Each structure stands twice: as structure tokens, then as C-alpha cells.
UniProtKB/Swiss-Prot annotation:
GO terms for cellular component: plasma membrane. The keyword Chaperone does not apply. It comes from the Bacteria. The efflux pump is composed of EbrA and EbrB. It is found in: Cell membrane. Keywords: Cell membrane, Membrane, Transmembrane, Transmembrane helix, Transport. Belongs to the drug/metabolite transporter (DMT) superfamily. Small multidrug resistance (SMR) (TC 2.A.7.1) family. EbrA/EbrB subfamily. It holds the Pfam family Multi_Drug_Res. GO terms for molecular function: transmembrane transporter activity. This is Multidrug resistance protein EbrA. One of its GO terms (biological process) is transmembrane transport. It comes from Bacillus subtilis (strain 168). The lineage of its organism: Bacteria, Bacillati, Bacillota, Bacilli, Bacillales. The chain crosses the membrane at residues 2-22, 35-55, 57-77, 84-104.
Amino acid sequence: MLIGYIFLTIAICSESIGAAMLKVSDGFKKWKPSALVVIGYSLAFYMLSLTLNHIPLSLSYATWSGAGTVLTTVIGVKWFKEDLNAKGLIGILLLLSGVVLLNWP
């Protein structure tokens, strides 16, 4: 089961990096960030497919999408100076709570 969570963590991180590179790629006009988008999302889906050998689909996908959304938001706020208002923060906290509850033993 631990290896499944390792695969899932890699999937979440690579998906978030791919999403961040979408912004940097300027509509796929810049080739290096565009290549990182393809690599990030390809690695994310490959790792997610490996995760499914160890963790059920419902738990894997919900965790991947929820944690990926949270991490992508953190990247947007920290590196791209995007705003996060009170409603957005509450939404992120609810997503995090849901991910924790889903994975609680």
C-alpha cells in the first residue's frame, strides 16, 4: 500500500508541475515549458495508472484531483502571485479535509 501512495504523490506533483508549465508556456509558444507540460502530464497519468494497482480507483482519483488542485493553487499563489480570497481559502481547506478523510484508516 505504501508504494501506491508513493506513486500517487509523484502523480500529484507531476500533474501540478505540468499545470504550472501551462501558464509559463504562453499558449504552447515556448517550447521548453510546453515540453514540461507534456512530460508532467504523461508522468502523472503513468504514475496514476501504477497507483491503481495498489489503491482503489475511487480513492486514488479523488485524492489525485483534490490534492493536485490544492498544490496547483499553492503554486499559483506563491510563484505567480495569484490572489486567494476567503472563499477560495475555505474551498482549499474543504478539499484538504476531504482528502484527509478519504485516506483516514
